[in-house]
A protein has these predicted regions:
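A generic structural signal for short, non-catalytic loop/turn and secondary-structure boundary residues
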Residues: 36, 45, 57, 71-73
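Polybasic, proline/glycine-rich intrinsically disordered low-complexity segments
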Residues: 72-153
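Negatively charged, low-complexity tracts enriched in Asp/Glu with abundant Ser/Thr
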Residues: 1-47, 125-153
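Canonical SH2 domain fold
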Residues: 48-68, 77-78
Length: 153
């Protein structure tokens, strides 16, 4: 409840065209809670918003403004803490897409890598991946990741 009607500190807001399959019913409250330290995110739905926060600090990082339909959810707008944008609004959208797929749907999909890491050594990329996505960040991609359908984990 602490996040209701809040946005991340130092946020940017941008439009989105994300959509996901949906059962048609939900209750307000947590939709994903970290079970172990290697889970890096918590996710809550209140009203028409999905709040995504860092699990161990509670820092609110993303708010996805949702439109719940009978069989899918559309996300038309995202508010993101500028720290997670990496100078690329599309990248921030990819992060939200990955978090929904990997955490709420338990899918195995590639996580997005920011362009700034393209020239970095593999160990730097691996460190970023673990810090950002923990045990769900199995493999990353610099390419477009929205639209990739994964396998159930």
């Amino acid at each position: 409840i602490e996040y209701v009607n809040k946005v991340p500190d130092d946020y940017v807001e941008f439009s989105s065209d994300l959509n996901f399959a949906y059962s048609g019913a939900h209750d307000d409250g947590p939709v994903f809670k970290a079970e172990v330290m290697e889970d890096k995110w918590d996710m809550y739905v209140y009203g028409e918003r999905l709040y995504i926060s860092r699990s161990w600090t509670g820092k609110l990082c993303f708010v996805a403004h949702c439109e719940f339909k009978s069989d899918h959810v559309e996300i038309h707008r995202i508010s993101a803490d500028s720290e997670f944008v990496s100078g690329d609004l599309r990248h921030a959208g990819r992060v939200v897409d990955f978090l929904i797929k990997s955490h709420m749907s338990n899918m195995v999909v590639p996580h997005p890598l920011p362009a700034r890491l393209r020239e970095e050594p593999a160990d730097e990329i691996a460190a970023y991946s673990f810090e950002m996505f923990g045990r769900r960040g199995l493999f990353g991609s610099f390419d477009e990741t929205i639209g990739i359908l994964g396998e159930q984990g």
